[in-house]
């Protein structure tokens, strides 16, 4: 067994290397000891590297750098910048390029930090571009952006307060206007209700006065029109008719009209009086009818004429009389014989 184990080690060794074996028992493997020298270790490593380079295209310089790069990046990102991975084989006997490897390691130590910084800034820029409002609110909540824009915040709060104050003022003004309208409207409604019955009937009397106010003597009857409405139901309608008949007889004394005839001509009183308004309306209608009947008579009495119907009939009678007079002036044939005038013969 000892010879078989020593055979592969002696394959790649140059001459001059000494291997000491101490075996007490050929079947005892625990007492096998090797004492390699420095030249032996160097030759073993060079032979292994040459075999790898010929078979796979492996170059030792690239291998050391690539392995160091990858392993150091992983270890620096996971464990921190203080922990560095160094292969045990290279760390034991590669001492020639220590300066170059240390410089390379320093560069690798700096690169992950720069990469992390770049990734953080890119992520921050994307976040700010996507949603500026959320980022600013998060900054404000975290307390990093407390005192950066105090003026803008105060302006926003002031504008909000102004808007609220304006809304409150408008609301209060609307309430005041509603209260004023409610307080004024009942008074005006009461005034209108009180004015309606008192102004309706005098208005009708005024209309009748305007219709029949062409004569000057009609002013004598105006006090009767302007009397209050409440006085109408107190006076009996028969008494009103008699008074009107007396006034008419006085105005037309020359014609000799009797009071009985005038009272018979006037319309009688209503049989049933329901309300004061109905009696007032009927009395106004009676006044209108009386004025229509009095108007031509008063005019004829003032102007010294008879009834207008008689005045219209006279021109017709005069025209007839004139016709008869013209006919009477014509010479008749009997008169011509008596006078002795010859009658011309008819051809």
Swiss-Prot record:
| Compositionally biased spans, kind Polar residues | 15-25, 195-209
Which spans does this entry mark as compositional bias, Basic and acidic residues?
A: 143-154, 306-318
Where is there biased composition of kind Basic residues?
319-330
Q: Which residues form the signal peptide?
A: none
Q: Where is the composition biased (Acidic residues)?
A: 179-194
Specify where the region named Disordered lies, as residue ranges: 1-40, 72-92, 133-158, 173-209, 306-347
Q: Which InterPro entries match?
A: DUF4640
Tell me what this protein is called: Uncharacterized protein C12orf71 homolog
